[in-house]
Amino acid sequence: MCAGSRVGDVIHDAELFTVGPDEVVVTFRTDGDASVTTVVGDQEISTNGSYHSVRMTGLEPETEYELRVDGAEPTDLLPGRFTTLAQPKGARLATFATVNDVHFGEVECGRLGTPEELGPILFSEPGADPYPAVMNAGAITEIEALDPDAVVVKGDLTDRGTGEEYQAFLDAYSQLGTRMHHVRGNHDAMVSHTIAVHAPNTIALPGVTLAVLDTVRPGVEHGRVTSEQLEWLEEVASASTKPMLVFGHHHPWDPSSSERNETYFGINPDDSEALCGVITRCESIGGYFAGHTHRNRVRHFEAARNVPIVEIACVKDYPGAWAEYRVHEGGYTQLVHRISTPAAMAWTEKTRGMFAGLYRDYALGSQRDRSFTQSW
């Protein structure tokens, strides 16, 4: 840190981002290079630079810890105390990761396409790598370090659905080898209706089966699930001897909602009700996981046995997210991670203020939206 500066004057946007059964991650930025100490319980780590990501491991499940970032006052996003998640019962059987809304080919960020844009609209700096390449490179690096059994990319692989953009996605994510599985999103079916048409399909892992649905209605942003796919899902879930988790690009409509709009931004009401019916009848299904909305959110529908109905924030801008899943004999834990390479954090610090400053709270979600443990 420069002489004459105080840490308390230069720390910004400190967030307790990830809370697991045995680890936490705190992120923040400083004005210029600074050395900052973060304390969790009796552990402390000092980090240096402008963008800081502090990971503390070796914590005990369901235990309260004190948290302190020297020079930062406690806030709603940086509480002075927190409690770690419960650990699912039984042995850990598998680990997998997901990403969504990676948007290869996108060149501007923050545009709604309405007559009156809220702004700001952001671009990569001239001569710099495109921000989708920067963000996805960071995600891939961190996922490779996790060494998961599988990676599911839940759609919006591209910006406009061109062959060149799709190839850029494949070139990047091929680093993950045969562990990588992907399904299209609405952006991928705007030009061609044949890109990434792989679903429905299953991915068999130790202790769990992943079922992937194609929720795209080509040419439009809202989604559907065909009756053929729902019949397939019910058949494979009914026959499964293992718990099952279901993935698609679009999120379901809430069957308890009084507003029934056939152009709902996610899966249309009729198909959402049918999907919830399958979840209700098939007790092997332990959750549904989507992207599309660019936010972290977890809902529970009585019409779907109150299993988690999950949306995960996008890779391409704030907060720059990917999700880790730890599968145990007795359940699973979801941990949403912030992509923390310096280049990625530099971009997401710019984009957190999009849409007239409203984007941070929308995209980030609560701690419970990002990290939770669910029993089978």
Task: Enumerate the language-model features and the residues they cover.
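Extended active-site neighborhood of metal-dependent phosphoesterases/phosphodiesterases
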Residues: 70-76, 80-88, 163-238, 266-278, ...
